[in-house]
Amino acid sequence: MIECPCPIRPPRMPAIDLSRAALIVIDLQPDFMPGGALACHEGDAIVPGIDALLRARRFGHVVATQDWHPAGHVSFASSHAGRAPFESITLYGQPQTLWPEHCVQRTPGAALHAGVDWSSVDAVIRKGSDPRVDSYSAFRENHGPAGTRPPTGLAGWLRERGVDEVFVCGLARDVCVLWSAQDAARLGFRTHVLWELCRPVTPAGDAPTRAALQRDGIMLADAAALSA
């Protein structure tokens, strides 16, 4: 699929009160940058904009997620004999993409990106630390051996602080950003995606991602208006 040469430009948003809103920055880590173990298309292009948004301190709360896998994680192609990265298998009755080894705990590629001022972050959610289960969403793990998607605790943390609206950005737009936004909407949060502050694994993922966001009632927001 060819990416549209004229990508969606969300309308500029009127000034809004963000004191009851949370910014959720998904997996801004070196292994997802160009040259990294699981590079996202133009992943480094969003770093300055996310840094500016965090420095603006417009949001009542800021959460970052961090992919944090143990060696030998079930999502790694290297954990399955004869399998290659980006192949799909069935795991616990659900489709599972097999990934290159990435974001292994306590390795440089798993760190939060050094080009961002993280001082405004209130909480960091580490995902994928269970060796048996992948974890795309900030809110729930993927399906595990019991056939359920255990919560990460983020939804309760946000509700305890009066948050009813979330803005999601980061990597990858067609995987962890999408799953996080979908879960946020299903859990009752008014949900926005900062499209220009996300990038996909490959541009081929953009059209189905747009369709999924629209289907689930998730809005696109203008990042420039939020950092002004």
Predicted feature locations:
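Structural recognition of alpha->loop->beta junctions
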Residues: D117-S120, A204-A228
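Glycine-rich anion-binding loop/nest that anchors nucleotide
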Residues: V163-C176, W195-C198
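Short glycine-enriched, charge-decorated loop/helix-capping segments at active-site entrances
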Residues: G36-G43, A138-G144
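Short, hydrophobic/glycine-enriched beta-strand segments
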Residues: A21-D27, F32
